[in-house]
Regions:
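Oxyanion-hole/transition-state-stabilizing segment in secreted/luminal serine hydrolases
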Residues: 1-10
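A short helix->loop->beta-strand "cap" motif at the edges of active sites that frequently abuts
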Residues: 26-30
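Catalytic His-Asp segment of secreted/periplasmic serine-dependent ester chemistry enzymes
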Residues: 37-124
């Protein structure tokens, strides 16, 4: 994405509608969003990656959802190049290879387990 093509308002509107659709179908559902990872666009660093992540995180409080900040968890800007060098990201530096997706799943599992273990049911 080139900077002029990312429209945060449109992005947020789409996510708000998705959240509303989920809540209409399952009113008591807990919703966990996962932010984007760093990436390339047309073989160059995607200048919108941070803006996409920031927009998604802005939904947490007003929409009462949780969000795992995958972008920062993996290292933020430039992390896709590190992941590629380690064999986790594909040559396009947009998609992960199988091991990259496995790594993301393991990281998410670890985050969820830590959150569950630190949860105090006596507090809302």
């Amino acid at each position: 994405m080139v900077p002029r093509r990312f429209d945060p308002s449109r992005f947020l509107d789409h996510y708000r509608r998705l959240i509303a659709t989920i809540r209409a179908a399952v009113p008591d559902a807990e919703i966990l969003l996962v932010s984007n990872n760093d990436s390339h666009y047309r073989y160059r660093h995607n200048p919108n990656a941070q803006a996409v992540r920031d927009a998604m995180l802005s939904l947490v409080a007003p929409e009462r959802v949780a969000c795992w900040d995958l972008y920062n968890h993996l290292g933020g800007k430039g992390s896709i190049d590190v992941l590629h060098a380690a064999g986790y990201a594909a040559a396009d530096r947009l998609h992960m290879r199988k091991d990259g997706y496995i790594l993301m799943g393991e990281l998410l599992y670890e985050v969820l387990v830590r959150a569950a273990l630190s949860h105090n049911p006596a507090t809302p």
